[in-house]
């Protein structure tokens, strides 16, 4: 399925699972991204990351990621160069990305001494688009626009794919 919008540069659709809901202080533990080229070619990547801090049980209850799962994973600093390369010269999209995912990504890059420069990119926040029609969550958006259930909700890979499907 092709995007409804015409791209003049790549678009990265992404989702983050983190240690909490504070984009400025919590840490990324899962980052899934789909890079869509102007010709429609898609490249998917998912990083499972060790946040360097304990994952609160109430957060694990939402996404299922435990300290044991990430204990041998790279930190964000270890993966920063690869993540930066994947996102290079791309516009950004996600569900609630403007209020959470983008600020969270900016903070993680800042902790490594890198400038993510999201202000130089266009943002397509699917939540804003959806809320203009029907104020709900990503699961409701997938049901409404795609006519299917959102299997794997609160998993970054499933949420990223669902966000791209809503965009299409």
Would you name each region that the model predicts?
Residues 123-135:
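Short, flexible loop segments at boundaries between secondary-structure elements
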